[in-house]
Structure formats: C-alpha cells, structure tokens
C-alpha cells in the first residue's frame, strides 16, 4: 500500500477525526445526528470529502468505527486504506477493529499494519462495548505498540436516534 505523502508545510490545518461513512442511505440514527449537530452541508460521499479537505489545504486522519455488535453499516478498513492511498497528499488511514472479534481481529490488524495501509488503530469503547483496560483489547494494543503506532479512543457518550446521548453505554465512557 502506498504510504501518505503529505507536505505539512503546505497545510493550513490537520483534522485528526474524520469519519468515512458507509456510502448507502442515511440510517435513522445518522439522520437524527445530522439534524442535532447541524452537519447537513458536510460532504458525505468520499470524493467530495477529499475535495473539501484538499481545497482548504487541510490534512486528515480518516477512519471508520467497526460496529460489528450494533450492525450499523460502516466502511471497511480496506476501503479506508484505499481512500487514503488515493488521497495520500491529504489523508492518513487508521483502521478500526472491534476487540471482541478476538483472534480474527488481531490477524486483520497484523495484515493492515504489515501492508503499511494504516498508521494507527481507532477504537471506540462506548460503541464497541469494552473498557479501555479490558484484557479483550490487549492483543490489539500489542500489535500497534510493537509497530509504534497510536491507538486513540474517545471516552464520551454515544449519540442515539432518540435525540439524546445514550445512557446505556455511558458506563464505557470513563
């Protein structure tokens, strides 16, 4: 996989939190979030997202959130890596692997890291239903620690389609 080639001196900013969403129709949860956060004008299709950032000279870390437990549609890690490869002047790919995937998730992480396709692991404890100190996540931490790659994770509540933040998963939010 082609590594990023970002000329940071040419950038005006760098966004470290850019979701690449699935390319199908919005789910009810997504519609409610767009309305709540007033983000309806933000580009959702990937070519437009790339152009949005490039035209403003903003670099970005792109990722998805693997939600295998919720069933919510999401982009795949390979799609995120491909996006970053196609837009290597502005994008750096992080993968997202649910720690509950176990050995299969660890093997996927090793493959993505070895290929050079990703430069970090984005976890989301409230959505993926684990505590940051849960041993279920240790094997993934080890893959990325060995590669000297970061593992950022938010610890805030999760937006739900009910028009509020979820209370059921706030226990994972620190």
Give the location of each predicted region.
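An N-terminally biased module of ancient metal coordination in phosphate/nucleic-acid-related enzymes
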Residues: 1-72, 78
């Amino acid at each position: 996989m082609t590594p990023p080639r970002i000329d940071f001196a040419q950038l005006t900013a760098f966004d470290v939190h850019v979701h690449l969403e699935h390319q199908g129709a919005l789910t009810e949860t997504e519609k409610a979030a767009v309305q709540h956060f007033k983000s309806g004008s933000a580009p959702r299709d990937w070519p437009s997202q790339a152009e949005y950032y490039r035209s403003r000279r903003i670099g970005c870390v792109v990722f998805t959130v693997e939600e295998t437990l919720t069933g919510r549609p999401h982009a795949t890690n390979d799609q995120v890596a491909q996006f970053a490869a196609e837009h290597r002047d502005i994008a750096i790919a992080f993968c997202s692997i649910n720690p509950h995937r176990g050995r299969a998730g660890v093997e996927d992480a090793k493959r993505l890291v070895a290929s050079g396709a990703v430069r970090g692991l984005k976890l989301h404890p409230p959505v993926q239903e684990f505590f940051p100190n849960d041993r279920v996540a240790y094997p993934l931490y080890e893959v990325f620690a060995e590669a000297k790659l970061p593992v950022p994770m938010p610890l805030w509540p999760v937006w739900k389609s009910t028009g509020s933040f979820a209370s059921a998963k706030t226990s994972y939010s620190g």
